[in-house]
Structure formats: C-alpha cells, structure tokens
C-alpha cells in the first residue's frame, strides 16, 4: 500500500485487528522509507440489492436515506445513536441475507418498522403514519392498539 506521507509504495503491516463487529479489519502500517505509521481499514465490498419502489422504479441501496428517515421518526426521542446504528446494521444484514438482486421498498419498510417498534413506540407510529399513508385518526388508533396488544 502506498504511504500517504511520502508516496512510497512499500509498507509493512505492524498490527491487524477486527473492527466494527468483525465487519472490518483495522491494520496499523509503517512505511519502509520514511518510517511514518498510519492506519487503514479493510472492508469487504458486498453489493447490496437494488430497491424496487411502489411505482416500479429501481434505486440503488442508499443507507443515508434510510438513516435519515429513521432519524426523522426518532426526532426528540430518547434513543441512543448506537441503537440506531445497530438497527441499521441488522437491516443491512437482512438485505444481504436475502441473496436477491432486488428487494421491494415495502419489504424494506416492514423491516424498518420492526426495528423502530423495538427502539421506540412513538417513532414506530410516526414512521408507520408516513409509510402507510394514514388518512385519518382511526389508522393511528389501529396501530396504537396493535402496540398495546404486544
């Protein structure tokens, strides 16, 4: 690997460790020319499926968009960032586990709702109201009654 300090192409690995719950390898490297040390992270590049929207259009997986939607539902709620990241991680794992090239937006939405139900019930109702396009108060009531039965 090229040294970021002197651009020399020969470096050696001093230390390797697993990071991010085993999803990455963290490597400490040293340049054979200038002696500077730096850290690299190695991640397997796995293609996530495309998302098929309700209108039939297809979009590449966009974790930022999903995170933004979840955070909007969780706005001003007492949920730790780590819990949100863990939920996103589980959704990503489920996407990979399908083995499919495409996943419907409705399936993805159901997974998000499952995660939000566990994180925060208010956020779950918020997300469900947008995702399922609630028209009136009775739709809210049905979702809330469903939560109370659990």
Curated annotation (Swiss-Prot):
A zinc finger (unnamed) spans 3-34. Binds 1 zinc ion. GO terms for biological process: negative regulation of DNA-templated transcription. InterPro entries: ATP-cone_dom (IPR005144), NrdR-like_N (IPR055173), RNR_NrdR-like (IPR003796). Residues 49-139 form the ATP-cone domain. Keywords: ATP-binding, DNA-binding, Metal-binding, Nucleotide-binding, Repressor, Transcription, Transcription regulation, Zinc, Zinc-finger. GO terms for molecular function: ATP binding; DNA binding; zinc ion binding. Its cofactor is Zn(2+). It comes from the Bacteria. PANTHER family: TRANSCRIPTIONAL REPRESSOR NRDR. Belongs to the NrdR family. Negatively regulates transcription of bacterial ribonucleotide reductase nrd genes and operons by binding to NrdR-boxes. This is Transcriptional repressor NrdR. It comes from Alkalilimnicola ehrlichii (strain ATCC BAA-1101 / DSM 17681 / MLHE-1). The gene is nrdR.
């Amino acid at each position: 690997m090229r040294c970021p300090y002197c651009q020399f192409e020969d470096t050696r690995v001093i230390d390797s460790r697993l990071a991010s719950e085993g999803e990455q390898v963290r490597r400490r490297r040293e340049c054979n020319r200038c002696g500077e040390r730096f850290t690299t992270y190695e991640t397997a590049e796995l293609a996530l499926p495309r998302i098929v929207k309700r209108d039939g259009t297809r979009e590449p997986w966009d974790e930022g968009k999903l995170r933004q939607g979840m955070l909007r539902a969780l706005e001003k709620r007492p949920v730790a960032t780590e819990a949100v990241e863990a939920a996103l991680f589980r959704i990503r794992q489920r996407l990979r586990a399908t083995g499919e090239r495409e996943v419907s937006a409705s399936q993805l939405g159901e997974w998000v709702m499952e995660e939000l139900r566990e994180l925060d019930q208010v956020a779950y109702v918020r997300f469900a109201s947008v995702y399922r396009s609630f028209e009136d108060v009775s739709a809210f009531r049905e979702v809330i009654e469903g939560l109370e039965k659990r």
